């Protein structure tokens, strides 16, 4: 008798993607974050759906509706904090996923990598419009400041900003459309995830050694389903500790004050996961230059497959580039910290140095290190 999962048109897709998928036998726990991102996405869509049942996207009632969710809806506080802190877990997993891709040379699977960059940008857009919805002070001013950056585009900038706002300031029309965007974008992300997986399964997964693993593959189930399940349990444990004990630790106190266009907060800053890009944005004194640097800080990831000149796949056997990689990670953490500090000396100076380092490491230092390591290889072999 033939096995149904191998022949049924729908089950065959699931089988080839999650059950009988040939997987390298040596992939480490750094490969767990793809499945964790999937779990985060499903959780965000479900909690978001339940929040949307009670939320009203009107400037007069948005803040009150969020208060109503937390106070009057059964377990509304839990759903709200799961959604807010789930976004943080989503970005932690995504940053680790990208970091692993850089470390192990996964960017050489260029189609998968490029779809991943589009996914990152789409997720950032979703998180940004979502942060505006509670209509607190930081929601309102964050929306005003970030959308205003588009006015730096020559000729069409001002018109574009007013078109996005739906008026001459961030108001009712802006909130309504941001809610619409926030609802639709996760489904676009889901579609992109399927494309991401489609391209990944065309080539097969990379592995820590960077060598071809076609001669040594094992089925995804049960080996990696069990391994991923452990990762999911650890993720949920960290998330529940955050939600139940420190629900507001990653948020901004200003967002508990209703939006007031007449009163500007002392320090306008986005959520923590955007701080590195925000630090790069404000380290450049020119508005258009800052916006370009902000966009390039993400799009520069697309250069990795192009500027890679190493004879080896990944950084496992490349000590010089490894050292530079960890400096890059430390530099990112410094940018994240600086992004949350006020715009004054010494933070502005630290931000400018860290921003220059961010781009220099990728464009200059890593390729030079690759060339040196290639020369060392020539000497030995």
Curated annotation (Swiss-Prot):
Heme in keyword set: yes
Record-level GO cellular component terms: mitochondrial inner membrane; respiratory chain complex III
UniProt xrefs under Gene3D superfamilies: Cytochrome Bc1 Complex, Chain C
GO molecular function, one term: metal ion binding
Binding site residues for a ubiquinone: 201
CDD domains associated with the record: cytochrome_b_C, Cytochrome_b_N
Biological processes per GO annotation: mitochondrial electron transport, ubiquinol to cytochrome c
Subcellular location: Mitochondrion inner membrane
The protein's required cofactors: heme b
Membrane topology (UniProt): Multi-pass membrane protein
Note: Heme 1 (or BL or b562) is low-potential and absorbs at about 562 nm, and heme 2 (or BH or b566) is high-potential and absorbs at about 566 nm.
Role summary: Component of the ubiquinol-cytochrome c reductase complex (complex III or cytochrome b-c1 complex) that is part of the mitochondrial respiratory chain. The b-c1 complex mediates electron transfer from ubiquinol to cytochrome c. Contributes to the generation of a proton gradient across the mitochondrial membrane that is then used for ATP synthesis.
Protein family according to the UniProt entry: Belongs to the cytochrome b family.
Name of protein: Cytochrome b
Lineage: Eukaryota, Metazoa, Chordata, Craniata, Vertebrata
């Amino acid at each position: 008798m033939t096995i149904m999962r191998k022949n049924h048109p729908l089950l065959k897709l699931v089988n080839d993607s999650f059950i009988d998928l040939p997987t390298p036998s040596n992939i480490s726990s750094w490969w767990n974050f793809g499945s964790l991102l999937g779990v985060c996405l499903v959780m965000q869509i479900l909690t978001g759906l339940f929040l949307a049942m009670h939320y009203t996207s009107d400037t007069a009632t948005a803040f009150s509706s969020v208060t109503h969710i937390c106070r009057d809806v059964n377990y509304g506080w839990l759903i709200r904090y799961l959604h807010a802190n789930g976004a943080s877990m989503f970005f932690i997993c995504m940053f680790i996923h990208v970091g692993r891709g850089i470390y192990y040379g996964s960017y050489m699977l260029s189609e998968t990598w490029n779809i991943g960059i589009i996914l990152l940008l789409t997720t950032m857009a979703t998180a940004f419009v979502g942060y505006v919805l509670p209509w607190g002070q930081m929601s309102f001013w964050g929306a005003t400041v970030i959308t205003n950056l588009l006015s730096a585009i020559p000729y069409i900038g001002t018109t574009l900003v007013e078109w996005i706002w739906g008026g001459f300031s961030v108001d009712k029309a802006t909130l309504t459309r941001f809610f619409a965007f926030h609802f639709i974008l996760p489904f676009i992300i889901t579609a992109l995830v399927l494309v991401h997986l489609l391209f990944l399964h065309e080539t097969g997964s990379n592995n820590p050694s960077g060598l071809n693993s076609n001669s040594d593959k094992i089925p995804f189930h049960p080996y990696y389903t069990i391994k991923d399940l452990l990762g999911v349990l650890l993720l949920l444990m960290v998330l529940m500790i955050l939600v139940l004990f420190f629900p507001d630790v990653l948020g901004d106190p200003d967002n508990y004050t209703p939006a007031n266009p007449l009163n500007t907060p002392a320090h306008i800053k986005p959520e923590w996961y955007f701080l590195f890009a925000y630090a790069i944005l404000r380290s450049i004194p020119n508005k258009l230059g800052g916006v370009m640097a902000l966009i390039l800080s993400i799009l520069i990831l697309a250069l990795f497959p192009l500027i890679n000149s190493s004879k080896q796949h990944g950084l496992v056997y490349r000590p010089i580039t490894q050292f530079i990689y960890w400096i890059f990670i430390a530099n990112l953490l410094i940018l994240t910290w600086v992004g949350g500090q006020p715009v004054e000396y010494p933070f502005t100076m630290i931000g400018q140095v860290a921003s220059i380092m961010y781009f220099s490491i990728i464009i200059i230092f890593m390729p030079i290190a690759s060339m040196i390591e290639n020369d060392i290889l020539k000497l030995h072999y």
